[in-house]
Amino acid sequence: MHRATESARPDAVFRDPLAERLAGDHGRAIVDHVPRTTRNGWWLVARTKIIDDAIAEAIAQGCDRVLNLAAGLDTRPYRLNLPPDLTWVEADLPALLAEKTQVLADEVPRCRLTRTAVDLADAAARDAFLNEALDGATKALVLTEGLLMYLDDSDVSALSAALQRPEVRWWMLDFAGPGLKKMMNKKMAGMLANAPFKFAPDNGLAYFENLGWRTVQVEALYSAARRLRRLPLVMRPLGWL
């Protein structure tokens, strides 16, 4: 719903014409029950724009495939300026992908879009999916937007190992720190009861560097939100940190 709200602004930083259709009444109900400080979705707007720009930059550098793991209601294949011959693969649970495919049945993606139903928590199923999805790729970007914070440390480590293969050039991810994890699990205890924040490494980016990854670009959400003029007034001092 936050993407739909942003898209309706005259100064929108991105346009997602399909967001409202996908969110529906359920999405509006969720927004109505979140804490007031996060209700305007500044963090989601910032994250969306950061990832949009990172994908565009990767494509300019020769990215030939995008894998969106736990793709959810993402509509980038329909709204970004993408090469028609780019292969974009969405992976998520069967029921979610089936509903999404039905809702978007009359829409045409701007690239070669495929969807694969897979339980990414199943190591064998995940590896089989990656083998198929990355076949023929040479510079793939893997996106795990809004996923890692719900995983255990061991699951993140296993996913990292699975993605360390020659076809993968970039891993675009987001994660929270221990302080945000504690605050979110407390403020949104009811909403997060079935999916609490779990992964929040004490050592931040060093966690991934210790697993063999090299940091190319990083930006805090509050910093991006301030740059985009979306950070709530009460939080603006954070943008200077």
Predicted regions and their residues:
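Rossmann-like AdoMet
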Residues: 1-67, 71-118, 123-132, 136
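Short acidic, glycine/proline-enriched helix-loop-strand junctions
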Residues: 81-87, 191-194, 213
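A short, conserved alpha-helix within the catalytic core of class I
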Residues: 113-115, 123-126, 150-166
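A short SAM/SAH-binding and catalytic strip from SAM-dependent methyltransferases
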Residues: 138-154
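Conserved beta-strand signature within the Rossmann-like core of class I S-adenosyl-L-methionine
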Residues: 141-143, 159-179
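Short, glycine-/aromatic-enriched active-site segment of Class I SAM-dependent methyltransferases
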Residues: 178-195
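Short alpha-helix
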Residues: 195-223
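Conserved catalytic loop of SAM-dependent methyltransferase domains
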Residues: 216-239
